[in-house]
Design a protein with these regions (language model features):
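N-terminal export leaders
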Residues: 1-3, 22-23
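Bacterial N-terminal signal peptides
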Residues: 2-13
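A residue-level marker of the well-folded mature domains of exported/periplasmic proteins
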Residues: 11-352
Length: 352
């Protein structure tokens, strides 16, 4: 009888824990094979809360700007968040180190970190956790695993979705260009790993690669240089939509046929894709991850249990899905999926 009671109690506790599963963002799920969680009420605190965020570079590109907007909007939405301090490392490792130390010194209740490089935030994360401050990591990897919660999107999966698409488009054989993101950024390193995984064992060969830094202007310079050097290319793997848009514009400028090229959930890219209909795929990497980080911080401060590690690996979008999200009334700088309200979308991206 005792055994039955114990099983029932365990089952009840398990059901309760499952019922409390926090939805951080659509597509974000606990990492399979990692059962680690925070303890119930481990970080529970009465509000108002002071939440800090160390952003690797708000103005690195249009996506990073919106990810910051998504984070700020999510914090503003919860009245228990008395203060949301967003510090911008501006693509400087030294600044990110100082920013995290600053947030620890300010005794914030939780810290969200988007690391610039795989090691730029490690010491700060360990220091914060040692001080009893929960740390949430997203949009980039860390070498340390001392963080409280990790949300890993994009990365290898993102790069592989694009690589698999090109392999399929080219029938397993052909020459491709590679446009990479910000050098040394963990997201760029992992997306590239995903591409290499996808083309391994095929006859798809990389004939040229360069860093477009996830920016339209730099991407355009890179693409134009590659085109003028040798326009014979069968497909293009682009690590970000602003660079994809730039490449599409280069091919248009020279009156050339646009080869299969990979995209991303960006309004400006969607406009070109819908208008021109070239072969593409859009892996998902929403700026809503900024909001997911804030939601994780709030959940911990509410005393909820979270998994230590989450993944965000949705399927790539096809043209039909892009058409559903595309907004003619918003600028090219808007990204999806986002949790920004209609009011915020119009404020930041409305074509006034």
């Amino acid at each position: 009888l005792l055994g039955i009671g114990l099983v029932a109690a365990t089952l009840a506790a398990w059901t309760q824990a499952r019922a409390q599963e926090v939805n951080l963002m659509n597509g974000v799920t606990p990492r399979p094979g990692d059962e680690r969680t925070t303890a119930p009420n481990q970080f529970k605190k009465d509000g108002p809360w002071k939440i800090g965020m160390s952003h690797f570079g708000v103005n690195a590109n249009t996506w990073t700007v919106q990810m910051a907007h998504d984070a700020e909007a999510a914090a503003k939405l919860d009245k228990r968040v008395g203060q949301f301090i967003l510090l911008d490392a501006n693509i400087s490792q030294a600044k990110q180190v100082a920013d995290i130390e600053d947030l620890v010194a300010q005794k914030v209740d939780a810290i969200i970190v988007t690391p610039l490089t795989p090691t730029s935030a490690d010491a700060g994360i360990e220091k914060a956790v040692a001080a009893g401050i929960p740390v949430i990591v997203h949009t980039g990897l860390t070498e340390t695993d001392k963080y409280t919660v990790d949300i890993q999107g994009g990365g290898v999966h993102f790069g592989k979705v694009m690589g698999d698409f090109l392999v399929k488009q080219l029938g397993g054989k052909g020459k491709i260009w590679v446009l990479r993101g910000l050098p040394a950024h963990p997201e760029d390193i992992n997306r590239y790993k995903g591409l290499l995984e996808a083309i391994k064992g095929t006859d798809v060969k990389i004939i040229a690669e360069d860093a477009g830094k996830w920016q339209y202007d730099v991407g355009k310079q890179v693409c134009e240089t590659l085109y003028l050097n040798n326009p014979q290319v069968d497909g293009i793997w682009s690590s970000g939509a602003d660079m994809t848009r730039a490449c599409v514009d280069v091919f248009q400028q020279y009156g050339a046929k646009i080869p299969p090229i990979t995209g991303e959930g960006n309004n400006g890219f969607f406009a070109r894709w819908i208008e021109l209909g070239f072969p593409s795929i859009s892996p998902e990497y929403g700026p809503e991850q900024g909001a997911a980080g804030v939601r994780a911080a709030v959940a911990l401060l509410e005393g909820k249990q979270l998994h230590k590690r989450y993944i965000y690996e949705p399927e790539g979008w096809d043209l039909e899905k892009a058409k559903k999200y595309y907004r003619k009334d918003l600028s090219a700088n808007a990204w999806f999926p986002t949790s920004l309200t209609e009011q915020d979308l119009q404020k930041y991206y409305g074509k006034h």
